Design a protein with these regions (language model features):
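Short beta-strand edge/turn micro-motifs at domain boundaries
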Residues: 11-16, 120-146
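A mature extracytoplasmic/lumenal domain signature
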Residues: 51, 61-62, 105-108, 140
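Sec/Tat-exported extracytoplasmic proteins
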Residues: 32, 36-39, 43, 54-55, ...
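Short, low-complexity N-terminal intrinsically disordered segments enriched in polar/charged residues
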Residues: 3-4, 8-53
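Surface-exposed, charged secondary-structure patches
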Residues: 56, 71-117
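Hydrophobic residues on conserved beta-strands that form the core of alpha/beta folds
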Residues: 52, 85-87, 136
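Hydrophobic pocket/interface hotspot
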Residues: 35, 46-48, 55, 69, ...
Length: 146
């Protein structure tokens, strides 16, 4: 489930700066939302299409290239996203020119691989505008048990 606070749709937390195109915040957020939807749908092709070729993913104390993420953690992230309901709240959407970042928090509760899950997460995504639209250049995920 995806939740968005009012601050993600209006006001200074996601104000665009000089060089930004009107509607960028909506397009940026749509890219992040589409990435999470692809994970939840089990669609690795769609998820990878939203990652820039030079994207890096930081999770579990490691830094992975796009190719390493595709080979290592992507399948587990898809499995987790499909198994454990999560509520995400976007706290910041900000763009300056062709670069943007989105910060979000999440709460996940459920069962994964026969283990109870209750966790709080934080996410930071850095995106850049390309000819194909906004693409994710970096993802940093962290979480803790509730």
């Amino acid at each position: 489930m995806f939740l968005c606070t009012a601050s993600c749709l209006a006001g200074s937390p996601h104000a665009n700066r000089e060089g930004a195109v009107p509607g960028d915040s909506t397009a940026i957020l749509a890219t992040v939302t589409a990435f999470h939807a692809a994970l939840a749908a089990g669609d690795s092709t769609a998820a990878l299409a939203l990652l820039a070729p030079d994207a890096v993913v930081l999770e579990s104390g490691e830094v992975e290239t796009r190719a390493e993420y595709a080979a290592h953690h992507l399948a587990a992230d898809i499995e987790f996203s499909r198994a454990v309901p999560s509520q995400r709240v976007v706290t910041l959407v900000h763009s300056e020119g062709a670069v943007a970042w989105v910060a979000a928090t999440s709460t996940a509760r459920g069962t994964f691989r026969d283990r109870a899950v209750a966790s709080q997460g934080a996410e930071l995504m850095v995106l850049s505008r390309t000819d194909a639209g906004w693409r994710i250049r970096a993802i940093h995920w962290s979480s803790r048990r509730l």
